[in-house]
A protein has these predicted regions:
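Polybasic low-complexity intrinsically disordered regions
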Residues: 1-124
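Basic, amphipathic alpha-helical segments enriched in Lys/Arg and hydrophobic/aromatic residues
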Residues: 160-220
């Protein structure tokens, strides 16, 4: 559904505008089941844009896989969506599904998940959310982030103990490793099938292989 273009600024006298529609997150907050939450998430082919670790924009067409992983680089939950879907739109279903499968303590997420609804949902499930701050064009928040970075460097320089949150947040890299395994070791870097069901099936087999492979490593 295409959104009508609106003129910038305040509406003219007598001009009426549609009320702001509730976000996907605010709708999901009121839902009980994962199936209901995912009914709001598109799986159609779309265009995705993200910023890589070097600060460059990457653009791709298709979909993306949202993964929840635990220690040992073991994927627990994976949800496929359109490439254009914002990561935060799948946060609540990921937390809910993963909580059904395993007991865990921390929800570690980057700045793309910085939302009060996600924090509250995580706490409701008995977890501690550790989510990076998204400055959202706020100079005050940027200053706060910079101050935290400066303090972190000082603590490292003097070899002083830091907040355990920093240690836990750094463990978020296990999801990146799962993505790496999926692309480099299990043939999911480029998928030429058409249709969300076929693509999601290929990715699901890849996730299953990683889960078995990493679990065997822990046993042996």
């Amino acid at each position: 559904e295409k959104k009508p273009k609106l003129k910038r600024g305040r509406p003219k006298k007598g001009e009426t505008r549609e009320a702001i529609k509730p976000t996907i997150l605010s709708k999901q907050k009121e839902m009980q089941t994962t199936k209901e939450m995912l009914s709001l998430v598109s799986t159609e082919c779309g265009v995705g844009i993200k910023q890589n670790s070097k600060g460059n924009r990457e653009v791709w067409i298709g979909g993306k896989l949202h993964i929840s992983a635990v220690d040992g680089d073991i994927p627990i939950t994976a949800i496929y969506s359109s490439a254009s879907v914002h990561d935060s739109s799948v946060a609540l279903p990921l937390i809910q599904e993963t909580s059904k499968k395993v007991n865990y303590l921390y929800d570690l997420q980057d700045a793309g998940y910085d939302a009060d609804i996600i924090r509250e949902f995580s706490q409701k499930h008995g977890h501690r959310p550790i989510i990076d701050i998204n400055p959202k064009n706020s100079q005050a928040l940027r200053d706060k982030i910079q101050l935290a970075e400066d303090e972190k460097k000082k603590f490292e320089y003097f070899n002083l103990p830091q907040s355990s949150d920093i240690h836990h947040y750094n463990q978020r890299s296990m999801v990146e490793r799962v993505n790496k395994y999926l692309k480099e070791d299990f043939g999911c870097n480029t998928i030429y099938y058409q249709g969300a069901t076929k693509v999601a099936s290929v990715l699901a087999f890849g996730i299953l292989c990683i889960c078995i492979n990493q679990s065997l490593k822990m046993v042996t």
